[in-house]
Every structure is written in structure tokens, then in C-alpha cells.
């Protein structure tokens, strides 16, 4: 599969405690199948971060890749927005 055909997702880093791995939560909105109300869905993905660049709270872009471990199927492409530390 070519790189431009792989799934690309945007999300927020919720954990960077593992070495070279980040946990990213991706939030989407969908319509309820029966009632039609907009519902917020969120899903967590583990992504490979080779240089430990992303920190907790950052907005990142991740891309689908080959399985890197039992749970990792994505890799970090870029940090879109750094978290503001107060």
C-alpha cells in the first residue's frame, strides 16, 4: 500500500510515558443511527514516536503503518501544535 493511501488521523497526545510510544486520542462526531443526534466518539491509538518529540497535550498527525508491536499500528508524522504549559 502506498504511503498516500494510508489512514491519516489527527489527535491529542494523552500519554508519553512509554519510550518511543505515545497514546493519541482521536475525537470524531457521528449521527446516531436511529435518533439522528450528533454524538462525540473518541478512540485511543498507540503510535510510534522514534525521537520522543511529542509531549502530553500536543496535537499530532499519525499515519497507519505495518504492525510495530502487539498494539502499535500507527506512527507519528508531525506535531501540528505544541501544548501550552501554564
From Swiss-Prot:
Keyword rRNA-binding: yes
Keyword set, alphabetical order: Ribonucleoprotein, Ribosomal protein, RNA-binding, rRNA-binding
CDD domains for this protein: Ribosomal_uS17
Signal peptide per UniProt: none
Origin superkingdom: Bacteria
Disulfide bonds: none
A GO term from the CC aspect: cytosolic small ribosomal subunit
Job of this protein: One of the primary rRNA binding proteins, it binds specifically to the 5'-end of 16S ribosomal RNA.
Protein name, as recorded: Small ribosomal subunit protein uS17
Organism: Streptococcus agalactiae serotype V (strain ATCC BAA-611 / 2603 V/R)
